């Protein structure tokens, strides 16, 4: 019996991934909103560091993001919490986001500069 107990723990740890609860955003939608959140954070960083902006429009930007994506803050936060409790799945999502962000960056860098 003592030898079987560690084996049971290993088997339990290797079981199939838990499906997200029904009230969460689906993976594709969550990834899209998370991409938008990364762009919001980049914009805020740009405004604060480069433009020395003193007001803090973070709530406005996130409200606009959630409205554009047709999700609520609560849906996003519940889904985010779920994936933080499933780090392997969250890591996979972030790896996909990095690819998408790199693609967006390349598209911006390749744009011709328009004189003012």
Report residues per predicted region.
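C-terminal motif of bacterial Sec signal peptides marking the signal peptidase cleavage site
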Residues: 10-13
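Sec-dependent signal peptide recognition
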Residues: 1-8
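Post-signal peptide N-terminal segment of mature Sec-exported envelope proteins
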Residues: 23-44
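Bacterial signal peptide processing site
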Residues: 15-18
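Short helix-to-loop capping/linker segments positioned immediately adjacent to catalytic or ligand/cofactor-binding
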Residues: 20-23, 47-49
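Compact alpha-helical subdomains of small soluble proteins
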Residues: 48-116
């Amino acid at each position: 019996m003592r030898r079987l107990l560690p084996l049971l723990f290993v088997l339990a740890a290797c079981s199939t991934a838990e499906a997200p609860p029904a009230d969460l955003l689906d993976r594709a939608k969550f990834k899209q909103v998370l991409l938008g959140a990364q762009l919001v954070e980049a914009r805020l960083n740009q405004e604060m560091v480069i433009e020395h902006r003193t007001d803090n429009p973070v709530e406005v930007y996130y409200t606009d993001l959630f409205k554009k994506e047709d999700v609520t803050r609560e849906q996003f936060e519940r889904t985010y919490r779920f994936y933080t409790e499933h780090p392997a799945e969250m890591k996979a999502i972030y790896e996909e986001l990095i690819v998408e962000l790199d693609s967006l960056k390349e598209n911006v860098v390749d744009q011709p500069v328009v004189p003012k």
